[in-house]
């Protein structure tokens, strides 16, 4: 099965999350060991659940097509695979390059822990994308619409008791970069250090502030691949 959705803050008192796993083949069984392929760890689930309307029930077994809710303390990400031991990865759940960007800042220093936890869980849920600028260490949130910024701000305040403020940042495009030429990639990152960031997976992201800057980078560094989705 694979994790297709994560819902953060199911219980605000415990900041709990539920990862939803779609069973694709075989039979899922409670307390049976499963391989978390990305992490290479074996996991057991003593209280998997299924949701019916407002009711949540513990499930002992599930079959292809069923959706199982698994307790998540931060170990899952969307697209993760669970198997009986096979090394298997599902494809088709990429993150696309955002259209809008803003800096996010903690507006209440006394609530730093809540702010950090909220950002982590909301990003894991897929509400938006987070990039950390390697030049100044600032967090950049990328979305496809203005409403997502409002949702993040509302949920941080009402679910995590944290406040944020948004600050403008002029960016044109975020793209993931890779190269088989390690020397050229290193040279690119040094020359473009002001524009380099990391996503939540630790991958290199180029934050171009204009179409011209992006076009020139593509021309000057022929051996670097610029990806506009995270699946490559």
Predicted features along the sequence, with ranges:
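Conserved nucleotide-binding/hydrolysis modules and their immediate coupling elements
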Residues: 1-101, 116-117, 136-138, 191-194, ...
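Charged, conformationally dynamic linker/hinge segments
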Residues: 87-203, 207, 214
